[in-house]
Regions:
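Flexible loop/hinge segments at secondary-structure junctions
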Residues: 2-169
């Protein structure tokens, strides 16, 4: 199999248990949801995982069955001097504006309003994102589009998007 990286730790456990019970090994390549979808459509793997659900026509065209396996959460991580784990609060609107490049510094009034007791530094914000075909990217960008109509119209939601800035990897 091949596909999403977020499910990989769970699949490792399942594969080990399956091998114990059956003596058969499961080979799974954590290459991203986009890669998994391409491989299942090309019939080069027996199963694939994607954080982005396939459309009905994709399922029918490729004679696939789709079902949920796990629930995955996406948590933005902030690393700032003097800020402790769990001390920073960001909401969807602020997060979307950070990724749109409209909020550029950590001491922006919108971030300060959510964190009135936190001493926010006058530092530039550097966003990081995935640049491969990622179901996590789809879910993250889909959320940003739901909380900010501008994100929805300018960027949209997909496994790969044209990020307005930041560092991809």
């Amino acid at each position: 199999g091949a596909g999403g990286t977020a499910i990989y730790p769970v699949l490792q456990i399942w594969a080990a248990k399956y091998a114990q019970k059956t003596g058969s090994r499961v080979n799974y390549q954590a290459i991203g949801s986009g890669g998994g979808i391409k491989q299942i459509e090309a019939k080069t793997v027996d199963f694939a995982n994607s954080d982005k659900p396939l459309m009905h026509d994709e399922i029918a065209k490729n004679n696939l069955v789709q079902f949920p396996q796990v629930v995955i959460s996406i948590v933005p991580v902030v690393h700032l001097p003097g800020i402790s784990a769990g001390q920073m609060v960001l909401n969807g609107d602020v997060l979307s504006k950070i990724y749109l490049g409209q909020i550029k510094k950590w001491n922006d009034p919108a971030i300060k309003a959510l964190n009135p007791k936190v001493n926010l530094p006058n530092m530039a914000i550097l966003t990081v994102h995935r640049s491969d075909g990622s179901g996590t990217t789809f879910n993250f960008t889909n959320y940003l589009g739901k909380v900010n109509p501008e994100w929805h119209s300018k960027i949209g939601a997909d496994t790969t998007v044209s990020w307005p800035g930041g560092v991809g990897g």
